Amino acid sequence: KTGQKDAFVVAVDVKQIAQQVAKEKANDPMFIAAMAALDKGQIDPVTEQLLLGTINKQIPTSTTVVPLNRPINVSSRDPQKATIMPKTLKTLTVENAEQVHPVAGTKYQTYAASSRLLYADGSVQTPLYANAAFVLKPGKPVLYVGITTDVQRDYFKPIFDNAFKSIK
């Protein structure tokens, strides 16, 4: 904590999550190739460009509102009861999203991206800044996500950037 600004960082074991999510794809050649790259901790330059191109096409280039909870449609004879609406609509607005890019000067291949966010929960809005880094540590790839209320990026952005570069 810095008084007015708060931040937290979470680390996600990418290999473990990939294995749990894709159990049914364990024999898929693309999954096997992806897991081999995660084990090796390296992606060749051609694959890197293909991956970055594919990922960056999915990143919003303009302000985008993402609903976090949507109405649920259920089967019902009464059309009035066919949709269950959430009590408050929660959204995440993505602004100034940065493209995923390689980070120079790191021990392991590292890729980073960041964005300003606006979390809205009914009448309450919380501006945030998120900075993420994917570190391809051999055998133990990790996704680090830092989130802060420092939306001006004066205090925590340099801290996040230096932390992601110094991962050993």
Residue ranges and their predicted role:
Residues 1-19, 23-32, 89:
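N-terminal "mature-domain start" segment
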Residues 6-7, 11, 19, 37-134:
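Signature of long, low-cysteine stretches enriched in small and polar/charged residues
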Residues 8, 31, 108-111, 134, ...:
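Phenylalanine-focused residue identity feature
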Residues 15, 38, 115-118, 136, ...:
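Residue-level detector of solvent-exposed, low-hydrophobicity positions
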Residues 28-33, 83-86, 162-166:
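Short, low-complexity, polar/charged sequence segments that are solvent-exposed and flexible
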Residues 26-29, 46, 151:
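Alpha-helix boundary/N-cap detector
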Residues 138-168:
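Surface-exposed amphipathic alpha-helical segments
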